[in-house]
């Protein structure tokens, strides 16, 4: 019982106890992803970024060989964090760049939520070294990360889990941060993320808002609804 009471990995994620790092969400890296649909990957990554912004999670964005190979980070991700410094690297392992280590230390949170490309390379090596050398706890966002094959992604996730990484998904992380729907200061922004990024769940929320609670539809443009006009039937 004593060990369980002192096991910090049993704690839920909160806005106060964690930080976030996005690793190499760049076009050339995304081109190689075969473990999941790449548009879904991008959707999930941007949704996670928006959630981190809502809850004021200290966030790091790092990139590799932007000009010579990988290309610019998803614009939709960067737009969530205007003015954010981007930590450029040459190393595959983010831990091998001193700027990244310094940023992690400055944020002062031992729980690190990680999303990146590719799972079997940059995510795996960073996680192993950050746990071993930095004593960080790693929460790997499986559906905002991708590998060159499904097997590569799955095996990398298994290796990391065996080493002590905690696997999570983007919506799981966001809802752990929210925790209680009575927290009204973040309720509406969280539901906006759900409506835009959570697929069928989001469509269901849209339906409930507009058809049950009679809230206005969320599109920004105006549209007329023209009444039915039956055509002649012969």
Residue ranges and their predicted role:
Residues 46, 98, 120-124:
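Glycine-rich phosphate-binding loop at the start of an alpha helix
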Residues 89-102:
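Short phosphate-binding loop-to-helix
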Residues 64-65, 91, 143-146, 172-173:
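Short, ordered loop/turn segments at secondary-structure junctions
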Residues 104-110:
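Glycine-rich phosphate-binding loop signature in dinucleotide/nucleotide-binding domains
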Residues 70-77, 101, 126-131:
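Distinct, well-ordered alpha-helical segments
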Residues 2-91, 106, 137, 154-158, ...:
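Active-site acidic carboxylates
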Residues 66-70, 92-94, 119-123, 149:
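Acidic, metal-coordinating catalytic cores used for nucleic-acid/nucleotide bond scission
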Residues 110-170:
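A contiguous pocket-lining binding segment that forms or flanks enzyme active sites
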């Amino acid at each position: 019982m004593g060990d369980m009471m002192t096991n910090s990995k049993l704690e839920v994620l909160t806005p106060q106890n964690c930080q976030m790092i996005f690793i190499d969400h760049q076009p050339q890296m995304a081109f190689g992803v075969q473990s999941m649909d790449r548009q879904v990957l991008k959707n999930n990554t941007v949704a996670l970024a928006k959630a981190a912004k809502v809850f004021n999670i200290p966030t790091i964005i790092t990139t590799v060989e932007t000009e010579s190979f990988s290309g610019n980070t998803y614009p939709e991700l960067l737009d969530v964090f205007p003015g954010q410094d981007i930590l450029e690297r040459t190393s595959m392992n983010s831990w091998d760049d001193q700027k990244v280590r310094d940023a992690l230390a400055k944020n002062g949170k031992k729980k690190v939520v990680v999303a990146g490309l590719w799972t079997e390379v940059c995510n795996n090596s960073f996680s192993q070294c950050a746990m071993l050398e930095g004593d960080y706890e790693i929460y790997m966002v499986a559906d905002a990360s991708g590998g060159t094959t499904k097997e590569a992604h799955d095996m990398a996730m298994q290796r990391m889990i065996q080493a002590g990484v905690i696997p999570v998904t983007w919506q799981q992380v966001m809802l752990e941060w929210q925790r209680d729907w009575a927290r009204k200061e973040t309720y509406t922004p969280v539901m906006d993320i759900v409506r835009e990024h959570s697929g069928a769940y989001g469509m269901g929320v849209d339906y409930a808002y507009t058809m049950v609670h009679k809230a206005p539809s969320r599109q920004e443009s105006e549209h007329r609804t023209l009444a039915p006009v039956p055509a002649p039937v012969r």
